[in-house]
Design a protein with these regions (language model features):
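N-terminal targeting segments with Sec-dependent signals, encompassing both cleavable signal peptides
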Residues: 3-9, 19-635
Length: 635
């Protein structure tokens, strides 16, 4: 029977953990969608997590962020209110809440929470911008980690595009064994396209095989998912003929190539190219049915706009369409890219940003309609040119290019990793028997004591909370039956793809049997030593505790009397009470070695002032007619 019961307990426990893992998988998927700017899809999953009552505070906050990004302040405010009044809230939430309230016209409320954000150490510049209606919502924390690529050359490098194990990129480095013309703009060789094979860990670039590279500029490029088709930019140089407009300018054009027998060949001119303006920077939609590009063709909004054109099944093209004023400005919009979720990214010097060209993402509502663009912030953007954004299909890594190092005329390629939210989780257990501890209280703070969250373990001893990376933390655990414990840990240098940090905690039981067994005091009737029914109930708690939870614990029995009667009589009576207690424990399952002593102390250890000669009521005397238990050993 016991084995069967234990099996059921284990089954329920494992099932509960499996359910939690499944919910965490959902949360991770939602977080990836969020960092990929797929806010509608992410919102749907966060709503599911809320319905499942999984990590609700976090899910409400993220759902509110999604709605704010989607410019739905009513729904954003609704979900911010689910977390805003809690004791420990990330400071960024106050700012986002202030932004949402301002969108609704609640200027008084917006100012209140903006001041609260500033008071908690928030950026005063953001508060000032909010008051001037110049704020644009941005993700709360940096969502990318950046490092310089190991295949940069001393020349200009940009336009990285990964397909399979190959990274294609554009560079003004010289091609081995090829005599190249020099571009008078910067006195470097004309741009060509190169590849790096990530599978071989070889950082030496190789020129793209085939007919792509010419005497003039090539790149950047985009490749279809099946790897058979490339669209790339090149100077207007086709069939070895260089064409200029009437002003003598040789513009950029987009060409199509096929991959055959390990070579890029069959170069084709596209029908919407024009000798009088540039068409460049191609980007394909995930399904390969739409081509995006940049052009300075007449009729646009600025110096260079972004356009799209449909690609038909027969290989023909539809009408070229301008992407409109939400994306295009009076400045330059360049280097479009569409990620696996269908979200458009691009570079612009016309939208508010950090410097010259900045990288922006686009936001769509639940109907798929473009509603806004948002700056990707630092570290993607700097005070210099930042462009040619590329994101891998998994949404967790990619490349950009930048001249942020102030190398005149030179651009470098940077690799980025998406920083997914980190989930702190663990199980609090008994250090003696390994059993999970339910209702343990956990206080999570930063190293400097800044409060983050108050947590409570569930029936399986499990806890979780989302935390920031690159931080040091304190985690204080407490429970009435256990000694307090402070655990120090950190989230430094954790790989970007790792989304969980496990901190398990073992608590040492207190050496107090009354506390451990939830024991009520065992009392005796006046001048009696028999075990009363209420006392028997308490003794069975002790038997259960020592049998099922602490099989190596040993205890001592200590019995007492009130002060009525002679001291010698009471000494004898207390011994009888100790003996009856001991015999009850042994006769009901405890072995003799578990109770190492059972002693009587007569009236020598009264719990109150009811000694000889002091008038006390019966309830007061009752408090002294008792048996206590002392833990001698716990292993």
């Amino acid at each position: 029977m016991k084995a069967h019961t234990l099996f059921l307990i284990i089954l329920v426990y494992v099932g509960a953990l499996s359910g939690l893992q499944a919910q965490h998988g959902k949360q991770q998927r939602a977080d990836v969608l969020f960092t990929n700017f797929s806010f509608v899809k992410a919102a749907d999953i966060y709503k599911e997590l809320i319905e499942a009552q999984y990590n609700e505070k976090y899910a409400h906050r993220r759902l509110a962020d999604c709605y704010l990004m989607l410019r739905d302040p009513e729904k954003a405010v609704k979900h911010y209110r689910q977390v805003i009044d809690q004791q420990k809230v990330a400071n960024e939430v106050y700012y986002n809440y202030a932004v949402a309230l301002r969108y609704l016209g609640d200027y008084e409320g917006s100012e209140k929470w903006a001041k609260h954000y500033k008071k908690q150490g928030g950026d005063a510049k953001l508060v000032r911008a909010l008051k001037k209606d110049q704020s644009t919502y941005l993700p709360n924390e940096p969502i990318f980690r950046l490092k310089e690529s190991n295949f940069n050359t001393p020349n200009s490098d940009f336009g990285a595009f990964k397909h399979g194990d190959l990274v294609y990129f554009v560079s003004s480095k010289e091609r081995d064994g090829v005599s190249q013309k020099t571009y008078s703009w910067n006195e470097q060789p004309f741009l060509d396209m190169f590849t790096i094979n990530l599978a071989t860990n070889d950082s030496i670039p190789t020129a793209v095989a085939g007919e792509i590279n010419s005497r003039y500029h090539e790149g950047p490029m985009t490749i279809s998912r099946d790897g058979k088709t490339m669209y790339f930019s090149r100077n207007n140089y086709y069939h070895k003929t260089k064409t200029k407009d009437k002003e003598g300018v040789n513009h950029l054009q987009i060409y199509k190539a096929e991959y055959l027998n390990g070579q890029w060949t069959n170069i084709q001119d596209l029908p919407f190219n024009n000798d009088n303006y540039s068409v460049s920077h191609p980007a394909l939609s995930p399904d390969g049915k739409t081509l995006y590009f940049a052009s300075d063709m007449p009729g646009g909004f600025g110096k260079s706009d972004l356009y799209s054109v449909s690609i038909h099944d027969n290989g023909s093209y539809g009408e070229v369409e301008n992407l409109g004023p939400i994306i295009n400005t009076e400045g330059e919009e360049l280097f479009p890219f569409v990620n696996a979720e269908g979200n458009l990214f691009f570079s612009s010097d016309g939208h508010p940003g950090h410097g010259l060209l900045d990288v922006f993402g686009t936001l769509k509502n639940d109907k798929g309609v473009l509603v806004e663009v948002t700056n990707l912030k630092s570290p993607i953007n700097s005070n210099r040119d930042d462009f040619s954004f590329f994101m891998a299909e998994d949404g967790l890594s990619g490349y950009i290019a930048s001249n942020r190092k102030d190398k005149i005329g030179n651009d470098d390629i940077y690799e980025f990793e998406t920083i997914l939210p980190l989930l702190l989780k663990g199980i609090v257990t008994d250090s003696i028997n390994g059993n999970p501890i339910a209702n343990a209280k956990l206080v999570l703070t930063k190293q400097d004591g800044t409060p983050i969250a108050d947590l409570t373990t569930d029936v399986n001893g499990y806890y979780q909370h989302s935390i920031q990376r690159e931080q040091y933390y304190n985690l204080a655990a407490s429970h009435p039956k256990y000694q307090d414990r402070l655990t120090l840990f950190n989230s430094m240098d954790i790989p970007s793809k790792q989304t969980e940090l496990v901190v398990n905690i073992k608590l040492v039981p207190v050496l107090d049997l009354k506390v451990l067994a939830d024991l009520n005091t065992i009392y005796f009737d006046f001048d009696r030593y028999n075990i009363r029914p209420d006392a028997a109930k308490e003794l069975h708690k002790i038997i259960d505790l020592l049998t099922n939870q602490y099989p190596n614990m040993t205890i001592k029995v200590e019995s007492h009397t009130d002060s009525r009667g002679s001291k010698s009589y009471n000494d004898r009576l207390s011994i009888d009470r100790a003996n009856s207690t001991y015999e009850y424990l042994i006769s009901n399952g405890l072995t003799k070695e578990r109770v190492i002593a059972h002693d009587g102390y007569g009236e020598h250890r009264l719990t109150n002032g009811c000694s000889d000669g002091v008038h006390c009521e019966e309830p007061d005397h009752q408090l002294n007619r008792r048996t206590d238990f002392t833990v001698i050993k716990m292993e």
